[in-house]
């Protein structure tokens, strides 16, 4: 089979996500291998492209995907309804790429065996001030934001680099830097069991008398996660030795962040370079060491 496909609207199965409008691809079926080539889709004012392949020649099908996306407006792609005309929790143009593979007789089995990597960056982004203060457990500033009303903090540096192995996603680097705080995430997301075990650490750049600076754990199923504090770290400042775990991976990703001739791309690279230098120079701002069990 050799078919050119053009679809005006592809529903992603969720009322929260914007459909793909339109989607065009070249379907080729030969010798038990189904390939979608030259995939070209639009969503959230951005573009998704790449190749997807399903190889059914073995007892268990092998699924591979090499995808890239750019200019996807997060606030358009993910519907974020908030009361009292508050700004969206997060905005910006999402760029990234995914190269993954999985094997099995069902979608669940393929996801449960997924391996590869995903990289993303949010350009010209903002994040809810209230969300940042809540993640950092800054009670004083959080109350102030509640009283005055939420506002959008510009994101200075945002890098996501996920590694997939046997259906488990782990952040090699997941950092979000604003003028207010730097947020780091480590842990794991299991596509096989649909469970998560994440740790979120926020290092504030300002002084607040009620900032606990306590790592937050998000654990449980995707459908019903629970949030708890890391008791052993309650009230403790992050130590100088904690930074180096994420510093080198962040520095290695900066050339990828800095790709492109646009002012936005250059600014993103400069901001992430500044964050990397600040981590190396100032222990108070350093990244947390990945949790060990």
Q: Model-predicted segments: where are they?
A:
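Gly/Ala-rich hydrophobic membrane-inserting helices
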Residues: 248-249
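Membrane-engaging insertion elements
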Residues: 257-291
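A small-molecule sensor/coupling module
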Residues: 252
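Small-residue helix/turn framework positions
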Residues: 1-239, 243, 255-271
């Amino acid at each position: 089979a050799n078919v050119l496909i053009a679809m005006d609207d592809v529903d992603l199965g969720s009322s929260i996500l914007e459909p793909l409008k339109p989607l065009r691809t070249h379907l080729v079926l030969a010798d038990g291998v189904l390939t979608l080539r030259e995939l070209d889709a639009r969503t959230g004012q951005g573009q998704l492209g790449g190749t997807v392949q399903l190889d059914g020649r073995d007892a268990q099908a092998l699924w591979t995907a090499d995808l890239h996306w750019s200019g996807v407006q997060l606030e358009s792609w993910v519907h974020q309804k908030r009361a009292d005309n508050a700004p969206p929790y997060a905005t910006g143009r999402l760029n990234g790429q995914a190269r993954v593979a999985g094997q099995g007789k069902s979608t669940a089995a393929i996801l449960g065996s997924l391996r590869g990597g995903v990289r993303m960056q949010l350009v010209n982004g903002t994040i809810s001030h209230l969300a940042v203060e809540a993640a950092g457990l800054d009670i004083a500033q959080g109350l102030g934001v509640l009283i005055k009303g939420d506002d959008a903090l510009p994101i200075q540096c945002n890098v996501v680099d996920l590694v997939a192995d046997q259906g488990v996603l782990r952040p090699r680097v997941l950092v979000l830097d604003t003028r207010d705080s730097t947020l780091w995430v480590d842990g794991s997301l299991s596509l096989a069991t649909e469970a998560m075990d994440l740790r979120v650490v926020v290092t504030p750049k300002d002084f607040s008398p009620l900032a606990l600076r306590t790592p937050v754990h998000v654990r449980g199923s995707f459908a019903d996660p629970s949030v708890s504090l890391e008791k052993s770290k309650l009230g403790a400042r992050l130590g100088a030795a904690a930074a180096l775990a994420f510093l080198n991976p962040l520095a290695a990703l900066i050339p990828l962040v800095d790709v492109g001739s646009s002012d936005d791309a250059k600014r993103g690279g400069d901001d992430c370079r500044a964050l990397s230098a600040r981590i190396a120079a100032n222990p108070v701002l350093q990244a947390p060491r990945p949790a060990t069990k």
